[in-house]
Amino acid sequence: MSRIETDSLGPVEVPEDAYWGAQTQRSLINFAIGKERMPLAVLHALALIKKAAARVNDRNGDLPADIARLIEQAADEVLDGQHDDQFPLVVWQTGSGTQSNMNVNEVIAGRANELAGKGRGGKAPVHPNDHVNRSQSSNDCFPTAMHIAAAQAVHEKLLPAVTELSSGLAELSMRHHKLVKTGRTHMMDATPITFGQEVSAFVAQLDYAQRAIRATLPAVCELAQGGTAVGTGLNAPQGFAEAIAAELAALSGLPFITAPNKFAALAGHEPLTSLAGALKTLAVALMKIANDLRLLGSGPRAGLAEVRLPANEPGSSIMPGKVNPTQCEALSMLACQVLGNDAAIGFAASQGHLQLNVFKPVIIHNLLQSIELLADGCRNFQQHCVAGIEPDAEQMAAHLERGLMLVTALNPHIGYDKAAEIAKKAYSEGTTLREAALALKYLTNEQFDQWVRPENMLAPGGKG
């Protein structure tokens, strides 16, 4: 069953049970591309904008109070997720996001008209353009929704997840702050370090990434709304930009303000590319953490085997008993995806030709995917990997005992050249450092015990 809806191009058949109208239906017909739906976070942000605009237009006397109330009621239902099935459009549409903006306008108008007792859909008493989109353009609504959705996702999902992982790693670091092991540079044995110190680097990297993300948020909270079609604010009343930003801040609890330059807010997306860059920083840190833990857990008998990673599942369909570092692999893969998304976002953001960037949907699609992947990845990695990590103290001690770089502690006492000779002799003859040093008669057994003490090699000023 269907009904007829109309737009400036004429009549269109729309499913009878749909709240959307002609423009949404045309997009479904003309852009049957891929399966990537416009993110619900963007559509909910658009609904929030419609609610805020209705309130501001009502206060300004630009919208009848009864129409404003109907719009707000319908928008609240959208925000509550009651009509998520009414947003079928894909990312691959007009680059301004106009079709998704109209999808939201039509759904809110269609539901508002039903609430008014006039049946589902239609344009009376609530019109999708004249009322729901009053004082707005897709060109300022969509970038505003992009910023709202990104800011909400970072605040509500990403930052708590990064904090959870960072806290878990900090606890692991503190628990093993005295456990001495072999450090490694260039993938080769180096001077000693504690396992706690090693893990503390992970914590610091995550903290830096988190600070980088937070630093981008003030610009993300600057909104394009009020710029309308090209940034001039045509058809928006004086003060509308400031009023709707304040309304959106009150509704969301986030510090949204009006963007100081609406022309840049429509044509450029530097705040979002900055956020994407900070997400890349986090992805790079996560890749390093995952790779290090994967290396330290390699084995169990023919690798480093210095840490035991939790076994989440059997690791092989052919090798019985094999367990793989699957959490590390999943985290590494999502980090790769985030790096790729950053590249796509950067290219799309560079396409702001003249007064409007028309690559907006692909920017926000990739950005929100990165935020979601990083948030889910951090939380999952903490719960299913980090929380169950146990170092193998015996293996660490064995590697430390066999290591040759403890010879570095002898540099201040016998000089670099003699210390290097000891290490070379021990390596070539398969002996210990002690045996090589005594054979060369460069020091006594007592001096070796006094000077080669790993626990004294862990901080500035430390020496044997």
From Swiss-Prot:
Site (Important for catalytic activity): 329
Membrane-spanning ranges: none
Keyword field contains Zinc-finger: no
Active site residues according to the UniProt entry: 186 (proton donor/acceptor), 316
Job description of the protein: Involved in the TCA cycle. Catalyzes the stereospecific interconversion of fumarate to L-malate.
Note: There are 2 substrate-binding sites: the catalytic A site, and the non-catalytic B site that may play a role in the transfer of substrate or product between the active site and the solvent. Alternatively, the B site may bind allosteric effectors.
Protein name: Fumarate hydratase class II
Organism: Pseudomonas putida (strain ATCC 47054 / DSM 6125 / CFBP 8728 / NCIMB 11950 / KT2440)
Lineage, top ranks: Bacteria, Pseudomonadati, Pseudomonadota, Gammaproteobacteria, Pseudomonadales
Protein encoded by which gene: fumC
